[in-house]
Regions:
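Non-catalytic scaffold segments within catalytic domains of secreted glycoside hydrolases
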Residues: 1-137
């Protein structure tokens, strides 16, 4: 911070009592772990077979629902915005047909994750926005 910025004690009390307008959530894929004392930190990655693996890792929209529900519970029902969600699937998914790129795995990924967000909303989680990972998603 700038040295000239010295909030007063009253300002700090107001800041600490405040609540953010929203919490931004970036989600691409889960990292699943299991207990393994022989590994550093006592954990090892756990395989998660999925129907269509991405460069990002396992595709698992249900883990997005779990994450949103956990944030909702632990942070007293904040407003959430999915600020990034997407995946890359590579040349196996990107077929050029005329002047169109057909990428059914990316489309399915996005559709499944939007459905996951809607499931969380139907369960009462205040998700107010959803942004794709990039222009190409």
């Amino acid at each position: 911070y700038a040295p000239a910025f010295q909030p007063s004690q009253d300002d700090m009390k107001k800041i600490m009592q405040g609540r953010p307008d929203f919490i931004g959530v970036n989600f691409y894929s889960p990292t699943l772990v299991k207990d393994d004392p022989s590994q550093p930190f006592g954990i090892a990655n756990r395989p998660n077979p999925d129907q269509y693996p991405s460069y990002n890792g396992p595709v698992s929209p249900s883990h997005l629902v779990e994450l949103l529900m956990q944030i909702d519970k632990e942070y007293d029902h904040p407003t959430l915005i999915i600020t990034e969600n997407g995946a890359g699937f590579g040349v196996d998914d990107e077929k050029l047909t005329g002047n169109r790129v057909l990428d059914p795995l990316r489309a399915k990924y996005l559709s499944d994750h939007i459905d996951a967000v809607l499931s969380a909303r139907h369960a009462g989680v205040k998700v107010e926005g959803y942004l794709f990972w990039s222009l190409l998603d």
